[in-house]
């Protein structure tokens, strides 16, 4: 069912510890059980499985439960050993797991959505199960009564969710590329603000309640850090993935962001450096360097008897420039550009070699990652995806041993 991998330790890359195989369809969620050698998985094959590591080093299913509908999302609350599973039919089901993780009892079904559930969060303090779905809404239900408390609709599929337990703020990402910040109440909610920055659907969110930072990953292959706590609208762009960003995890202790994309890319971003905001793109009717007209500026084209040019933008200064004045390419990691992007000639000349030093490390997960989660205390990561495989990684070589020991170098 599962192979134990003995990789030769590499000082600079994640170490693959185990590979779990056995699901008959895509694995939509995999969660590490804290303080246990165990993983909980949910799959499109309609099963929830709890895998425990045996003496042989292999993971075997101690619980194998078949659902009525494909499993699309999952949340696990370790202190109360409660599992919440969202399904393709819109229902959320609650289970309680025994102390030895060998038995799972059904508790109740929540009629949360009319369509596929995309994300679930359980709040013990309020006894709410909060979820988003492809019926374009976020709902919150009482786990004591099983009743629907409230629901808020969006204009497109709600795809991901984060929740601040202290303030009862919910962050919901959707397929239009928008993130909505809501204040949830017992039977109502209010929209605080909407965040717009992505050019593709938002696939994942991560909220850090300590620094009050929100991270979002999207199908435009980019990550945005929203400084909610700073109250100045500061955003940082991180571009280094070559495919849709599927999962995020911020390590508060070491100020690192771990991200995974659907092509198997695993990135670790150093957020403990002074980064710069990417500029807003400026609009102009002519090149802001050589003043040649752009192709829609018919008057200047006629007056100067010249052909109009295509408009481009320098990623460093944001100016509208022609192709001739922006012929060079450069990475600029301090602004989040880990690979080469278009810059104008004057900005290219201003970028020093040390400015091109990468502020992230990139690794290969070697499978199509659709979901990732971490046990930050142990420096472990689990990835799963459309190839039906679950992989368990030791991330301490790339994020530092300080995680495992609780020691921060800062």
UniProtKB/Swiss-Prot annotation:
GO CC: one term? nucleolus
Q: Does the keyword Transmembrane apply?
A: no
The name this protein goes by in its record = WD repeat and FYVE domain-containing protein 1
Q: How does it assemble?
A: Binds PtdIns3P in vitro with high specificity over other phosphoinositides. Interacts (via WD repeat 2) with tyrosine-phosphorylated TLR3 (via TIR domain) in response to poly(I:C). Interacts with TICAM1 in response to poly(I:C). Interacts with TLR4 in response to LPS.
The record's note on its domains: The FYVE-type zinc finger domain mediates interactions with phosphatidylinositol 3-phosphate in membranes of early endosomes and penetrates bilayers. The FYVE domain insertion into PtdIns(3)P-enriched membranes is substantially increased in acidic conditions. The FYVE domain is required for its function in regulating TLR3 signaling.
Say what the protein does: Positively regulates TLR3- and TLR4-mediated signaling pathways by bridging the interaction between TLR3 or TLR4 and TICAM1. Promotes TLR3/4 ligand-induced activation of transcription factors IRF3 and NF-kappa-B, as well as the production of IFN-beta and inflammatory cytokines.
- Cite the InterPro entries for this sequence: G-protein_beta_WD-40_rep, WD40/YVTN_repeat-like_dom_sf, WD40_repeat_CS, WD40_repeat_dom_sf, WD40_rpt, WDFY1/WDFY2, WDFY1_FYVE, Znf_FYVE
**Keywords carried by this UniProt record:** Endosome, Metal-binding, Phosphoprotein, Repeat, WD repeat, Zinc, Zinc-finger
CDD domains, sorted: FYVE_WDFY1 (cd15756)
The cellular location(s) given in this protein's UniProt record come to:
Early endosome
Instruction: Give residue ranges of the WD repeats.
Output: 22-61, 66-105, 112-150, 153-192, 197-236, 240-279, 364-403
According to its UniProt entry, the protein's GO biological process terms are: positive regulation of toll-like receptor 3 signaling pathway; positive regulation of toll-like receptor 4 signaling pathway
Q: Which residue stretches are annotated zinc finger (FYVE-type)? A: 281-352
């Amino acid at each position: 069912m599962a192979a134990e991998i003995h990789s030769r330790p590499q000082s600079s890359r994640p170490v693959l510890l185990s590979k779990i195989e056995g699901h008959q369809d895509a694995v939509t969620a995999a969660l590490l059980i804290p303080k246990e050698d165990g993983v909980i998985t949910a799959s499109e094959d309609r099963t929830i499985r709890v895998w425990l590591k045996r003496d042989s080093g292999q993971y075997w299913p101690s619980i194998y439960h078949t659902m009525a509908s494909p499993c699309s999302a999952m949340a696990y609350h370790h202190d109360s050993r409660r599992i919440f599973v969202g399904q393709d039919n819109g229902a959320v089901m609650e289970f309680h797991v025994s102390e030895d993780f060998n038995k799972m009892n059904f508790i109740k079904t929540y009629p949360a959505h009319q369509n596929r559930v995309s994300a679930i969060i359980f709040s013990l303090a309020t006894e709410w199960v909060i979820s988003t779905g492809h019926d374009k809404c976020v709902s919150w239900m009482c786990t004591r009564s099983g009743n629907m408390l409230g629901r808020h609709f969006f204009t497109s599929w709600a795809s991901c969710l984060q929740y601040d337990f202290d303030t009862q703020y919910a962050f919901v990402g959707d397929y239009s590329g928008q993130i909505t910040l809501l204040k949830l109440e017992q039977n109502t909610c209010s929209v605080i603000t909407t965040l717009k920055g992505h050019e593709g659907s938002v696939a994942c969110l991560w909220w850090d309640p300590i620094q009050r930072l929100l991270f979002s990953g999207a199908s435009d292959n980019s990550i945005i850090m929203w400084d909610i706590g700073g109250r100045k609208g500061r955003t940082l762009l991180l571009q280094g993935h070559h495919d849709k960003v599927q999962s995020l995890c911020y390590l508060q202790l070491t100020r690192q962001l771990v991200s995974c994309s659907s092509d198997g890319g695993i990135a670790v971003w150093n957020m403990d450096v002074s980064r710069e905001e990417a500029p807003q793109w400026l609009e102009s009717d002519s090149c802001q360097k050589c003043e040649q007209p752009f192709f829609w500026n018919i008057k200047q084209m006629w007056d100067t008897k010249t052909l109009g040019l295509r408009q481009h933008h320098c990623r460093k200064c944001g100016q509208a420039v022609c192709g001739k004045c922006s012929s060079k390419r450069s990475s600029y990691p301090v602004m989040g550009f880990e690979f080469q992007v278009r810059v104008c000639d004057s900005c290219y000349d201003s970028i020093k070699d040390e400015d091109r030093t990468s502020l992230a490390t990139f690794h290969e997960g070697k499978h199509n990652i659709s979901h990732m989660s971490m046990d930050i205390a142990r420096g472990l990561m689990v990835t799963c995806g459309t190839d039906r495989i679950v992989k368990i990684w030791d991330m301490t070589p790339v994020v530092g041993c300080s995680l495992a020991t609780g020691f921060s170098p800062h």
